[in-house]
């Protein structure tokens, strides 16, 4: 098996950084400079749906947006059955610094990722795994970049998901409610839902829903229960698509009323509650454009308390 350096001879001092679900991640320094690059090595042979390294590569190569991680170079090792994705090294991961960055930076991150999602929607691309680990920062002041398209999907590059989409997408308590009910025909609404959760947690510094991960026992049923106890028990009258989800009728849920957002996010400004309430909702989730149009007023309001 050829070494990582064989495929990226313009990098030196290549060292292992971390491991992902289907990848090994290395970091190296460009020769004759101090600039760092990340090398993500993903297998092509042993797929773990919805992970698809080649599809992710093709989607990323088709994207050109200032707040979406850009591929600098890529290589395929046919002998080992691996794909190499080279990107610029970013100093911070949002999940590591959420409680340290300023209100102003948080507002900028929301607007920058909203712009990225607006771009993805325009081009028919679903990210399907938005959470703080997949938001990278150049510095503690940003800018922010949406990263990791390993389970992304697009109409142009559907991979094996041609007839129907896989519902097992997302990470932990960020999973969209329709995927928990086995929906195979979801759209951009899944990214809007997860983005809403990210915004809520960015400004509250606490998890919006509970899937049991904090106790070491993550559960789809526990996450579903947490969502329903928070947003109220859905029904086909308020959410017509619900009756089409394969797993909706497999359970009988207690009838919970929806909690007011002032109770769900008591420590968060009402302007943030308003934005989140239009994203983390069963039906008619707001578009990224709504967030972009609304957030300048939010930023101005929050700056008074900064």
Curated annotation (Swiss-Prot):
Keywords from the named record:
ATP-binding, Kinase, Nucleotide-binding, Serine/threonine-protein kinase, Transferase
Keyword Repressor in annotation: no
- Identify the InterPro entries for this entry: CDK, Kinase-like_dom_sf, Prot_kinase_dom
Keyword RNA-binding tagged:
no
Any one GO biological process: G1/S transition of mitotic cell cycle
Which GO MF terms does the UniProt record name? Answer: ATP binding; cyclin binding; cyclin-dependent protein kinase activating kinase activity; cyclin-dependent protein serine/threonine kinase activity; protein kinase activity; protein serine kinase activity; protein serine/threonine kinase activity
Question: What is the reaction catalyzed?
Answer: L-seryl-[protein] + ATP = O-phospho-L-seryl-[protein] + ADP + H(+); L-threonyl-[protein] + ATP = O-phospho-L-threonyl-[protein] + ADP + H(+)
UniProt enzyme class: transferase
Q: Which residues are in the Protein kinase domain?
A: 11-306
Show the Gene3D superfamilies listed in the entry: Phosphorylase Kinase, domain 1, Transferase(Phosphotransferase) domain 1
Enzyme Commission number, as recorded: 2.7.11.22
The residues listed in the UniProt record as binding ATP, with positions renumbered to this chain, are 17-25, 40
Residues annotated as the enzyme's active site: 129 (proton acceptor)
GO CC annotation: what is one?
Answer: nucleus
Q: Which domain of life is it from?
A: Eukaryota
Q: What does this protein do?
A: Acts as a CAK-activating kinase that specifically activates crk1 of the crk1-mcs2 CAK complex.
Q: Which family does it belong to?
A: Belongs to the protein kinase superfamily. CMGC Ser/Thr protein kinase family. CDC2/CDKX subfamily.
**What is this protein called in UniProt?**
Serine/threonine-protein kinase csk1
Please tell me the species this chain comes from: Schizosaccharomyces pombe (strain 972 / ATCC 24843)
Q: Which gene encodes it?
A: csk1
């Amino acid at each position: 098996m050829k070494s990582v350096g064989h495929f990226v001879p313009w990098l030196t001092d290549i060292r292992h950084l971390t491991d992902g679900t289907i990848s090994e991640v290395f970091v190296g320094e460009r020769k004759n400079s101090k600039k760092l690059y990340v090398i993500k090595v993903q297998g092509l042979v042993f797929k773990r749906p919805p992970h698809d390294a080649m599809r992710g590569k093709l989607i990323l190569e088709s994207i050109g947006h200032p707040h979406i991680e850009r591929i600098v170079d890529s290589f395929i090792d046919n002998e080992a059955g691996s794909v190499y994705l080279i990107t610029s090294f970013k100093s911070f991961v949002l999940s590591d610094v959420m409680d340290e960055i300023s209100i102003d930076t948080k507002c900028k991150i929301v607007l920058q990722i909203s712009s990225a999602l607006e771009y993805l929607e325009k081009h028919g691309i679903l990210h399907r795994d938005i959470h703080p680990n997949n938001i990278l920062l150049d510095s503690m002041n940003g800018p922010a970049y949406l990263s990791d398209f390993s389970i992304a999907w697009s109409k142009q590059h559907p991979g094996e998901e041609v007839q129907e989409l896989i519902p097992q997408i997302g990470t932990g308590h960020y999973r969209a409610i329709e995927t928990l009910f086995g929906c195979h025909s979801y759209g951009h609404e899944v990214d809007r839902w997860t983005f809403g959760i990210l915004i809520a947690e960015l400004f509250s510094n606490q998890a919006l829903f509970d899937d049991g991960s904090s106790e070491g026992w993550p559960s789809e049923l526990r996450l579903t229960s947490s969502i329903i106890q928070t947003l109220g028990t859905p029904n086909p009258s308020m959410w017509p698509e619900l009756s089409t989800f394969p797993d909706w009728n497999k359970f009988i849920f207690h009838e919970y009323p929806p909690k007011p957002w002032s109770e769900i996010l008591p420590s968060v400004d009402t302007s943030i509650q308003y934005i989140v309430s239009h994203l983390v909702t069963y039906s008619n989730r707001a578009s990224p454009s709504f967030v972009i149009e609304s957030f300048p007023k939010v930023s101005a309001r929050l700056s008074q308390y900064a």
